[in-house]
């Protein structure tokens, strides 16, 4: 019989579900998390749950919070089940489930209530998952966008803010006025230098209100950066039904994720932190090398298989990974051209990390799609592939595979796969990309799009390699070009 999840049913759940191995009544709050989505509950909440199961860090339980309508919807779903979440790991060998109990409360979705809770001394860390767009970055300058309408509205009425950074400013100002130590602001969003992004937003907002307050925040508030990783697909009715049928539990807001998770944190917590190193979190002095490793090996790998996977007619990522040509192409490209550009990290084997990445890409249970990886190529290629090309050229190293990857992306932008089936190009620059692709595959001399490629647009070595790869694709087709690359020196 299916049971609705709450504290009263934990002892009656089947043995197939791991339940909390700690007395929840012994927990007290230490972290307030803004943006309680799927990723937070599959990642940070699970790490803390593991720590509590060791009987440690019991004063670091999570209080959920948010300011958006979807935060209110999440609160409404979690409240009747006592803030519990069923986390199902999509392992190729079979599903596994656990009830995560590290969240003990969720503040009313109301800015004054949130500010009040932030000003309680038990809150020593404020963590964030508010998405990349939530940091109000000016697309032109890269700085904090103080002219954004939502920010302007808060600045006109700073006593009643409605944005995350207006709320954080108000809470920090009140804590300072009452001589209470500030909390640490810990971004858990999946973007490079997330701590610097959080600092830029909080200080940028503060400086628009009070220079003295901004100076105090810069001097006294810590913003550690972190690298986070765990594939967490969206939860829909299919996932809720899967959990009902497999585990006999009714959860209004379950989470599904891959078994892999990683968290590397800059160890900068002046107000204290839980001992998460005991449950697998890596604390380091500098997160940047780990971010670069992930950016190039994992994100670069996604970019590498996306377009060739689409051109060879694959729908799912795991299907592409069973294609011997694509798997061999990815392994050669990563091993010979991408991995050597990542600076060494003591104690980390990049080949082992690559093997883990390829295993993750091969996980059929996750059901990741090629079309998702192909989205916004004009935004992703400059982040994940072009910097690697520049690094190799600066060191006079060959770029044969990377030029082929770029040519495969260009071929994808023509809008059809190798069998002639239509490809829907989902990119804000779709029209420009199509025009570029038609030009590159019709002219005797293939060219690149200057606005996108920057200095590579005039680099003769890159242009020659790109032209060679595009010409080969045009003459031989995708399959034979791949085979030629894989079997080559």
Regions inferred by a protein language model and the residue ranges of each:
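Substrate/ligand-engaging "lid" and interaction regions
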Residues: 2-489
């Amino acid at each position: 019989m299916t049971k609705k999840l709450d504290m009263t049913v934990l002892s009656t759940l089947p043995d197939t579900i791991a339940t909390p191995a700690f007395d929840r009544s012994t927990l007290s709050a230490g972290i307030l998390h803004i943006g309680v989505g799927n990723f937070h509950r599959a990642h940070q909440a699970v790490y803390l749950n593991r720590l509590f199961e060791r009987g440690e860090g019991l004063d670091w339980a999570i209080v959920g919070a948010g300011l958006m309508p979807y935060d209110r919807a999440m609160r409404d779903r979690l409240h009747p089940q006592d803030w519990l979440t069923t986390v199902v790991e999509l392992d190729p060998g079979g599903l596994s489930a656990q009830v995560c109990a590290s969240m003990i409360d969720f503040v009313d979705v109301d800015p004054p209530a949130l500010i009040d809770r932030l000003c309680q001394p038990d809150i020593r860390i404020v963590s964030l998952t508010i998405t990349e767009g939530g940091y109000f970055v000016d697309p032109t300058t890269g700085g904090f966008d103080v002219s954004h309408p939502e920010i302007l509205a808060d600045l006109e009425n700073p006593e009643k803010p409605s944005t995350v950074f207006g709320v954080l400013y108000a809470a920090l100002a009140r804590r300072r006025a009452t001589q209470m130590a500030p909390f640490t602001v810990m971004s858990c969003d999946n973007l490079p230098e997330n701590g610097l992004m959080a600092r830029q937003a909080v200080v940028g907002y503060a400086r628009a209100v009070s220079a003295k307050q901004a100076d105090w925040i810069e001097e006294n508030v810590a913003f550690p950066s972190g690298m986070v990783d765990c594939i967490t697909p969206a939860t829909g009715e299919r996932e809720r039904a899967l959990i009902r049928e497999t585990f006999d539990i009714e959860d209004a807001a379950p989470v599904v994720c891959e078994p892999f998770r990683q968290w590397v944190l800059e160890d900068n917590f002046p107000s204290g932190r839980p001992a998460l190193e005991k449950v697998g979190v890596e604390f380091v002095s500098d997160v940047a090398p780990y971010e670069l490793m992930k950016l190039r090996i994992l994100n670069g790998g996604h970019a590498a298989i996306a377009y060739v996977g689409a051109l060879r007619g694959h729908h799912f990522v795991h299907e592409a990974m069973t294609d011997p040509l694509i798997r061999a192409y990815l392994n050669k490209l990563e091993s010979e051209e991408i991995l050597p550009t990542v600076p060494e990290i003591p104690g980390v084997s990049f080949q082992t990390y690559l093997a883990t990445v390829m295993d993750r890409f091969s996980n059929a249970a996750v059901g990741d799609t090629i079309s998702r990886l192909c989205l916004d190529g004009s935004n992703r290629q400059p982040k994940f592939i072009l910097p690697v090309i520049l690094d190799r050229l600066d060191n006079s190293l060959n770029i044969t595979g990377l030029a082929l990857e770029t040519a495969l992306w260009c071929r994808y932008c023509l809008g059809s796969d190798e069998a002639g089936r239509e490809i829907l190009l989902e990119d804000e620059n779709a029209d420009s990309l199509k025009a570029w692709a038609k030009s590159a595959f019709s002219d005797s001399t293939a060219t690149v799009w200057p606005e996108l490629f920057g200095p590579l647009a005039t680099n003769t070595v890159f242009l020659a390699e790109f032209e060679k790869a595009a010409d080969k694709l045009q003459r031989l087709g995708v399959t034979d070009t791949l085979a030629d690359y894989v079997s080559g020196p």
